[in-house]
């Protein structure tokens, strides 16, 4: 999959680019997206119906993740196994801080950081709205809050199609006072289960350094 760099575009938009834009959530609720990253339900009664579950498992970095890749923009780092993963600054995606790839395989990742803090509860809908500008059929197949290395994150699995390619995304969304992080892996939908263990081990390397 040599064209993998093109796929970064689907989720590489900054999270905070909307000013009073109407959007439809993946569960059908209409919301107003505000410039500060918050949103308001058009129908107030629908707000109570939205519930993202919390996974009771505590996730932590793999013992084999021996290298700490530090963000230069926000106070976070990413533990990874350099024997398995190649990584570096992006060549074709100015919104990403780092790109990663499983050596010799078709699993890729992107780390997008911003200095703006965004409420964790708003990230899913904003990310979906951004992604649908390029892949209108992007939808959530799994969502939950997790505790990862002591920090609460939002975990999303998304399916979408771009240029006929069926892509699966799995990653963490995290924000603190230093900014916001999207740590996302992706591959083709038919390879998601084959690469699930590697994908989860990679994103579980996310740590707060503040």
Where are these regions (language model features)?
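Short acidic, glycine-rich loop/turn motifs
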Residues: 25-27, 102-104, 160-162
